[in-house]
Amino acid sequence: MKPTTVIGAGFGGLALAIRLQAAGIPVLLLEQRDKPGGRAYVYEDQGFTFDAGPTVITDPSAIEELFALAGKQLKEYVELLPVTPFYRLCWESGKVFNYDNDQTRLEAQIQQFNPRDVEGYRQFLDYSRAVFKEGYLKLGTVPFLSFRDMLRAAPQLAKLQAWRSVYSKVASYIEDEHLRQAFSFHSLLVGGNPFATSSIYTLIHALEREWGVWFPRGGTGALVQGMIKLFQDLGGEVVLNARVSHMETTGNKIEAVHLEDGRRFLTQAVASNADVVHTYRDLLSQHPAAVKQSNKLQTKRMSNSLFVLYFGLNHHHDQLAHHTVCFGPRYRELIDEIFNHDGLAEDFSLYLHAPCVTDSSLAPEGCGSYYVLAPVPHLGTANLDWTVEGPKLRDRIFAYLEQHYMPGLRSQLVTHRMFTPFDFRDQLNAYHGSAFSVEPVLTQSAWFRPHNRDKTITNLYLVGAGTHPGAGIPGVIGSAKATAGLMLEDLI
């Protein structure tokens, strides 16, 4: 039997490969880089380990399900450690909000910001849980292949006011601006503007309250390695440094996948975990339907990009939380500039990752591994020269962190590297250097998103951030479940 080919060993591609292999379908997993993981790549330098991308595990059950399919337990392959608080949220005014899973502690903190918002938060949590039940548990792994699928979901989505933005819905319950930011920033974790993204994405709050926030011992890369080992234990084949040049088609069927080094792999089906525009524009450029789909996709709104700094210090800043969100002086205005303006803002808001707070093995003794990211416009919004802007932004961020959060940072610096929108474009083939693929606005969600199964090329499937349900680890693992269901129907 010719194997099924999965292009890309990100979380979505890995999860799909495991599901297919566990069901008895031989899978060939092709990864263009020298390590699996996709955006969850790992850098190692002078004893420091840096997770390149996702660092927040919020639905362990979705990962555990993959291992259960093989009759295994997640804990046999990787240990998940609880993270408390989930996030520490900080403002330049000096205000701090430790967001965790203890209702009493949360309400006590909310009381200090605005007593009236305690009841408002309870109502918001009820709403978030209702959206979580409908949008995540019911619809998160259901492929939307026809408009009828969308119509069936429409009444409940209307009841939940899905046309409202995340921020608008939060603001309908909560008065204090700090708290509005605290409960609306989550959509930025999946590339969504809180002022434009559907309020359905408030479900992320309920998701975290339901299952907590976790971190793999050894870093997110250890989870990737655990999933690779599971896939190989099932008999799956992984090929690294396998850069796909194109897919060979006969009529509306893919016959083979070609690599840039000349290798050719016959296949019975292809699931692409690569960027969706790259898949249609570059890998299927000879197929008329793919060209049409590529042109259509290039008119869609893409999510923002990111500027990321990985740095190792000869000092462990134990005053930090594992996850810190550093809000700058502006919120709405800054986000508007990131998503809609041709230029780079003078100010920024940051996410600071300090994993040694939870797992000290990620740095030499007494040292600390860190990364900090700033949301920035993608290259289609602001076509900046990041060889110029990158070093300037790096210096501004290091100075800011040293002043506000990490005294002595620059004198403690052992190693650092940058990852810019150019790198998202060049290393990950991300269209416009987008960090999260298609922007998750309502008119680009569910049926309006690129479908998990192509409607013309009969054995082409999509998995990952660019298809339903969207970005984030729970999203792409959910997409793998949706796509696997379709493939098993078609291939068995």
From Swiss-Prot:
Gene3D superfamilies found in the cross-reference section: FAD/NAD(P)-binding domain
Pfam families, per database record: Amino_oxidase
Activity modulation notes: Inhibited by NAD and NADP.
Gene Ontology molecular-function annotations: FAD binding; oxidoreductase activity, acting on the CH-CH group of donors
Major site of localization recorded for this protein: membrane
Enzyme Commission number(s) of this protein: 1.3.99.31
GO cellular component: plasma membrane
Residues given in the record as FAD binding sites: 5-38
Keywords in alphabetical order: Carotenoid biosynthesis, Cell membrane, FAD, Flavoprotein, Membrane, Oxidoreductase
Reactions it catalyzes: 15-cis-phytoene + 4 A = all-trans-lycopene + 4 AH2
Subcellular location: Cell membrane
Major enzyme class: oxidoreductase
UniProt pathway annotation: Carotenoid biosynthesis; lycopene biosynthesis
GO biological process: carotene biosynthetic process; carotenoid biosynthetic process
Cofactor(s) the protein needs: FAD
UniProt function note: Converts 15-cis-phytoene into all-trans-lycopene via the intermediary of all-trans-phytofluene, all-trans-zeta-carotene and all-trans-neurosporene, by the introduction of four double bonds.
Family stated for the protein in its record: Belongs to the carotenoid/retinoid oxidoreductase family.
Protein name from the UniProt record: Phytoene desaturase (lycopene-forming)
Organism encoding this protein: Pantoea ananas (Erwinia uredovora)
Organism taxonomic ancestry: Bacteria, Pseudomonadati, Pseudomonadota, Gammaproteobacteria, Enterobacterales
